[in-house]
Amino acid sequence: MNESQLILTMVAAVGLGTPLIFATVGEIITERAGILNLGVQGMMLIGAVTGFWATFQTGNLEFGVVIAMVCASALSAVHAFTSITLRVNQIVSGLALALFGSGLASFLGRAGSEPLVGHPSRAQFEPILTGGIADIPIVGPLLFGHDPLVYLSWLVAGAASYYLFRTKMGLSLRAVGEDPASAEAAGVHVSKVRYVHVLIGGALAGLGGAYFSLALTPTWQDDPIGAAGWIAIALVILASWRPWRAVFAAYLFGAAERIQFTLQTLGEPWSDIPSTLLAMLPFILAIVAMIVLTSGKRARFLGAPAALGIPYFREQR
Amino acid sequence: MTRRLIVEPRGLASARLRILVPVLSVLAALVVGGLFLAITGENPLDVYGKMLDAAFGSANGVSNTLISATPLILTGVAAALAFKMLVWNIGGEGQFIMGAVFASGIAIWLGPGAPSWVAIPAVIVAGGVGGAVWASVAAVPRVYLGTNEIITTLMLNFIALSFMNFLIFGSSSPWRDPAVSTFPSGRPIPDTAKLPEFFKRLDIGIFIAIALAVAAWWLIGKTRWGFAVRVVGDSAATARYAGIRVSKKILVVFLLSGAAAGFAGALYVAGPVGALDPRSLDLGLGFTGIIVAALAGLHLLAVIPIAILMGALNNAGPALQSIGVPAATVTMLQGAILIFAVAGEFFIRHRIRLPRREPVSVEMPDGVEPA
């Protein structure tokens, strides 16, 4: 592989990794509150379809992004209600959300007299910071000339990191995820904190979904995001619940997804490797990393919120 | 002071409630689905009428509904078995595919020379083995290293799907039909390995699926071994005190769960599909099994009627497309049914009542509520 192809792969990995950053940081925030939401795939798809629809109606990209975040957040509210208020099984509830969201997104894309499916977006995010600085060798194409949402994703990861580890509210949030009874004794409103952060997680998943339909592949198709929502759930563990690590984990997975196209350009013998096998790579990477990271004593240092997935019964303290 | 609803855990829910919750879940999902249908300009009643007609309105419809239900009975058993043990096997999809790969592989390897009484049992057993092998990739790390099985089983679904695509689209494997060169497809399995049909296109796979579900119910509900398994599912700590080897029980149930999904893959290949055909096997039947199990309250016999209901829904998808309504209506409805079924768990687990009399009012400082 020569240098320029390496750079091209890395630049493509940034594009493919960006929606994963949004969704993963969102899920980190949700899980830090002690709520496991496996419905990321559904929330991302709802974000993708509603964001596309809103931009299709108005031609306004920012409006599309806002609608995507609001709608995905509304979907996550369903999970918040079942897992926080009704305190039912979070795993099954999250899966239900994923199924419902996928079905509804596909339905909305095909329903009505003039369905969205097959239409290109009326607007799409364009690269910024192009020109001179983007021509600096190696650093230029990696740091500059991306669309604005790439920079927003760095901002979101940085802000989430600051919020979690440097603010009082972040401390309360982590307390709720670790030991809700003690947090409540210290005056934190556990249910409220959990609701708020499930909704934030939903909004960020919606933003990640909208990145697919408004920036990465700005045409509406039935299955626009692949398995991104499921991968994001694995990335949370690989990032050990830390937003900054999610950025690097997401780019690593972006690169793993991109590698099949890179190998095509390298000629034999690389191009002979079937793309159907290379498509497995991100998932194999996730499993191996999971087994290595979470087995035995290492698991304790990973930083999983202690109360993750456990319903909180105020009455049974 | 207003009268507050009292929510308290209840012991065993009545049989009436256990039936009422799934029925209301389906009705509530139909209302939600109806709203979305109405927003997009469809008449929900017309759409539902069409679905009912497609599923049960004709002999062909009933036959197709039961064909769709056959794999769902077993993927439902797969999810119910695992979930009972708090083993979160979300990998029914991948285990179903690997069951199909193993089953079609053995059928092609045996060839048309093997008599049906050899080929059919071999295909079904191979399917179970394929599903169990695929489950073991997640089960062994879970049991011996404590690796979270939710993520591993999920990822294994996508790997299995890519592997099936590789066998058909990415290589000239024995699974691929050499006769069709323009568009790759699966090699048809020999007729001797196919399940006999008896009612329209419905084959005996439905009886095999029901028999396996009953066997699973008997194994868990009626045997000594099953009793030990249920103790582990209720409380691993209790089981350990009682001298039950917990990790071995979890491993075996995980593998049985995988085998059940694998059997489903085998019956689908030896039944309606007749080849390892990615287009007919990538339908989310493993995921639908989770809905079946949840709606059945993880009861291994209740899985059977619920699977028929879900099969009816699946079967209605193509009929909707023919009248210009998206087939995804079905997925949307199934997702909504699962959401309401999960929410309904609350009412099975808790009792809500109004206090009979005004409770003795106690003066509390601001912001503090009486416990």
Located regions from the model:
Chain B
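Cytosolic-side transmembrane-helix boundaries in multi-pass membrane proteins
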Residues: 1-28, 34-38, 234, 241-248, ...
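Membrane-interfacial amphipathic/re-entrant helices at transmembrane-helix boundaries
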Residues: 2-75, 117-118, 122
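Short loop segments and helix-boundary regions at transmembrane helix junctions
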Residues: 9-20, 83-92, 113-184, 219-224, ...
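Hydrophobic core segments of alpha-helical transmembrane domains in multi-pass membrane transport
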Residues: 22-37, 75-80, 100-106, 127-131, ...
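Single transmembrane alpha-helix segments in multi-pass membrane proteins
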Residues: 35-40, 50, 55-110, 124-150, ...
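Transmembrane helix-bundle core of multi-pass membrane transporters
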Residues: 59, 153, 157-222, 275-276, ...
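Helix-loop-helix "hairpin" substructures at the membrane interface of multi-pass membrane proteins
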Residues: 133, 199-276, 300-305, 371
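Transmembrane alpha-helical segments in multi-pass inner-membrane proteins
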Residues: 255, 261, 265-335
